[in-house]
């Protein structure tokens, strides 16, 4: 065993950190996971302690070594993937954050975002960054920290403070301050990065009064950014050579290397990303334009659609309504439903995401009769996830002017066979479920391994994460369109009800 080499992926998520060791076949050798504290200072605010995140990462690195018996000198390279947009500002000399990390979900900077919109910057920001102006992205979070921590603006202008998303923070810590870098995919989510010119945008920085000296250097997704300081990696000096935001890492882990390839991660929400190739395409229908990844001197762009409620709708059945004991049980109930699919659940618990962007909408149910059973209700909830995915896939095809032939899927709810079959039916295309559902961590490992020659090229990677199961559509066209028309009616009625509430 002592001669075998491995790749370690660090997957720093919203609620936990994980370290996974992969072998040459792309198989998981061991993993370790640690949750950390969610901080809610006020309603709608979400923060993390950046030092606690760093401690959790150190803990899972140790855990992965202990579980596997792999030694630090057997790790050929490290790949990092992370919760995107979450913002850290720290003191360059002490290495201490000057405020908590402001998390992507946090709405504390919404007034700043509204101010930018009212000043007429929507189109300018969209053309430069591919994003809509929103508190979701890092730009307003940096501005908020500089405004609310005494003396921060002045210190930033003197070059005493550094900004980074979580990838940047972890590389800076692992290298003991030797590398202050980010990658294309994370930079593209800051709302400060010009994704066409591939540079920090001076005009946006001026509008927000953010000193350029704070910003990390932007690098490709697969290159050596630095080496671990031996005292942070149990004596090992290992290259950190792959980085990507979590959804882009999943795109890469799903081997979606060709333009037109699309992946959907069924997590708490659902994130659908299409590789659009080397040409940047601005969405005309409220999807986000972003960078998928950049390797070998080329940058590949992507369109992204976000669904707020996917797997969490099944959690609601379990925890809120107590209709199921556990999430996998929903499949059994759905298969035992014998109604004619006339019940529609619109799970707009926190509004509707793409392509509607209706924050006032709330959850609703249509088509109930005296004969409606628990099984019917559970089935309708699962179907709502598939209908929302169709909303985005239809929009993507219009934006990209291309027909999507197959949808690559991963994430927890992708294990639900009923949902996957209904997804294939309502889209009318094949659903390819990855054999290895650890696609986010695998994507980071692939990027790291390519850079150091652990894997030779994309062709070698294509042999590693084959499709586990293919779901083919079996519903006839008229039935499919009749069901989808009912969904569109249900969404419209939900939005009308929200208007009446005003």
Swiss-Prot record:
What are the Phosphohistidine sites (modified residues) in this protein?
Answer: 232
Can you tell me which residues bind ATP? 14-16, 268, 311, 315, 412
- CDD domains noted in UniProt: FGGY_EcGK_like
Family affiliation: Belongs to the FGGY kinase family.
GO biological process terms held by the UniProt record:
glycerol catabolic process; glycerol metabolic process; glycerol-3-phosphate metabolic process
Q: Give the transmembrane ranges.
A: none
* Gene3D superfamilies in the record: 3.30.420.40
- Which reactions are catalysed by this chain? glycerol + ATP = sn-glycerol 3-phosphate + ADP + H(+)
Any single GO molecular-function term of the entry would be: glycerol kinase activity
In Swiss-Prot or TrEMBL terms, this protein is called Glycerol kinase
Residue ranges of coiled coil = none
Domain of life from the UniProt record? Bacteria
User: What is the organism field in this record?
Assistant: Streptococcus gordonii (strain Challis / ATCC 35105 / BCRC 15272 / CH1 / DL1 / V288)
The organism's taxonomic lineage, starting at the top: Bacteria, Bacillati, Bacillota, Bacilli, Lactobacillales
